[in-house]
Every structure is written in structure tokens, then in C-alpha cells.
């Protein structure tokens, strides 16, 4: 099934460029379109701010964390599906993210097939 590149674009928000590249390669190999952002602030200034089909977000980033980004989007009524990935997650963080509406919360290293399944589910594919 061909993707509409504008309505099915996945935003990757992570301050680690190697992780951005790895996630983008994984998604593109699965036939999905992705665009990378090095910070929550960069994403908020972009044209995908409230229009991305799904977000893959690192929890811990300089300045604005993934959880703060999630709260900001909620304030602005941007109801985007968010999948969190983190190397520093704990139960409290996971509960907070899920209560705020996260689709998934994956600890690094994570299962690539599980991530793809969650992304496809968020995209209703």
C-alpha cells in the first residue's frame, strides 16, 4: 500500500544523531517516511509541529524533555501519537508518559519489530 508522504510522515525527535539515522533507516527500510529533529524546540518550529502522523521521541534531551514536549503538544491540542524511546526510563516516567497519552514507551535497546508494529498501529496501517 503506497504511503501518502505528507499525511504519513513520522517525526523522529532525538538529540543523538546516530539514533536518528538508525531509526530513519529502520523506518525507510519498512517503507515508511521519516524526518529527523535534534531537539523538541526544533520540532516545534517545524511545519510538522501539529501535522506529523506519529512521533518517535527520546525522553531525555537538553532543554526540553520528551515529556515536556508531550505536555506542550497537549496544551496546543495537537493530538499526535507519541512513541517514547529512552535509555533512562523508569516506572514513574513510563506511567507519566502513558497517562499523558503515549502510544508506547520502549527502553533502549528496543526490539525493532515491536517499534515498527507500534508505528504501524499508530498510523492505522
What is the predicted role of each segment?
Residues 50-57:
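Active-site beta3 strand of CheY-like receiver
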Residues 38-39, 65-69:
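Acidic catalytic/metal-coordinating carboxylates
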Residues 76, 88-89, 100:
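Short, conserved "switch-loop" micro-motifs in signal-transduction and mechanochemical regulators
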Residues 61:
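Receiver (REC) domain active-site loop signature in two-component systems and cognate sites
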Residues 108:
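A Lys-centered signature of the CheY-like receiver
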Residues 1-11, 17-19, 24, 45, ...:
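Non-catalytic signal-transmission and effector/linker regions of two-component phosphorelay proteins
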Amino acid at each position: 500500500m503506497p504511503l501518502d508522504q505528507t499525511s504519513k510522515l513520522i517525526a523522529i525527535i532525538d538529540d543523538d544523531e546516530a539514533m536518528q539515522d538508525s531509526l530513519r533507516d529502520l523506518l525507510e527500510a519498512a517503507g515508511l517516511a521519516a524526518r529527523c529533529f535534534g531537539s523538541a524546540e526544533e520540532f516545534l518550529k517545524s511545519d510538522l509541529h501539529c501535522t506529523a502522523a506519529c512521533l518517535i521521541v527520546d525522553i531525555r534531551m537538553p532543554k526540553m524533555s520528551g515529556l515536556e514536549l508531550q505536555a506542550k503538544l497537549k496544551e496546543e491540542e495537537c493530538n499526535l501519537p507519541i512513541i517514547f524511546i529512552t535509555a533512562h526510563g523508569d516506572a514513574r516516567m513510563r506511567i507519566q508518559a502513558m497517562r499523558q497519552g503515549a502510544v508506547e514507551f520502549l527502553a533502549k535497546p528496543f526490539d525493532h519489530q515491536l517499534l515498527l508494529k507500534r508505528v504501524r498501529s499508530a498510523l492505522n496501517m
